[in-house]
């Protein structure tokens, strides 16, 4: 699968009721193994089952990989800015992994916004991936850990200015997260001079 694609997971109850949810892939490449990261929503129809009930050996109905718009490939040579909110990191970690695996020379930078350090996905992976070719910036909306470069708060114009590749370098930008986060960040990027056509977004809702 390509970095940034997703799959549809369908669950069928004993009475025939079906629920389908889309989940981004944290994996990419030619492997037969796919990796999903599921953020459990307690009142959700699908995520609680995937998190609490699925066991090794269980079979799931999966369709995909799907998507050709929100993808990054190593053939792209322009700078790449990734911006994630919460579990929106999943398709972006796939891009970062592929960037490292293929030895891409394209500058890549990630701004990862979470409520607190405990809410972050792939903390260890990001620490291992971070190098001169892949910069990682953190934004904490509720509680910033000791030693953080900035106090806790929502991503704003100052965050974009300090922690992203400037529009003058003409990066491709990928933004993924909850709908409100994605819309707010996209507006901030446009205000900072990024052309809308260079901003690709993916948002999520139901679980």
Enumerate the language-model features and the residues they cover.
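Ferredoxin-reductase
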Residues: 1-58, 114-116, 140-143
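Histidine-anchored nucleotide/phosphate-binding helix
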Residues: 89-101
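Reductase modules of NAD(P)H-dependent flavoproteins
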Residues: 107-207
């Amino acid at each position: 699968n390509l970095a940034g694609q997703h799959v549809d997971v369908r669950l069928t109850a004993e009475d025939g009721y079906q629920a389908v949810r889309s989940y981004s892939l944290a994996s990419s490449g030619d492997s037969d193994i796919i990796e999903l990261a599921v953020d459990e929503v307690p009142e959700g129809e699908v995520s609680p089952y995937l998190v609490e009930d699925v066991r090794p050996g269980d079979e799931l109905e999966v369709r995909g990989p799907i998507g050709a718009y929100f993808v990054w490939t190593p053939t792209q040579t322009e700078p790449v800015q990734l911006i994630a909110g919460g579990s929106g990191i999943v398709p972006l970690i796939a891009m970062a992994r592929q960037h490292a695996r293929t030895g891409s020379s394209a500058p890549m930078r990630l701004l990862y916004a979470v409520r607190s350090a405990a809410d972050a996905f792939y903390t260890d992976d990001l620490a291992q991936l971070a190098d001169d070719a892949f910069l990682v910036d953190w934004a904490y909306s509720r509680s910033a850990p000791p030693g953080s470069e900035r106090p806790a708060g929502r991503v704003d114009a100052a965050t974009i200015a300090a922690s992203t590749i400037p529009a003058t370098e003409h990066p491709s930008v990928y933004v993924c997260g909850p709908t409100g986060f994605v819309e707010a960040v996209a507006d901030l990027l446009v205000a900072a001079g990024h052309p809308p056509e260079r901003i690709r977004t993916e948002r999520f809702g139901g679980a």
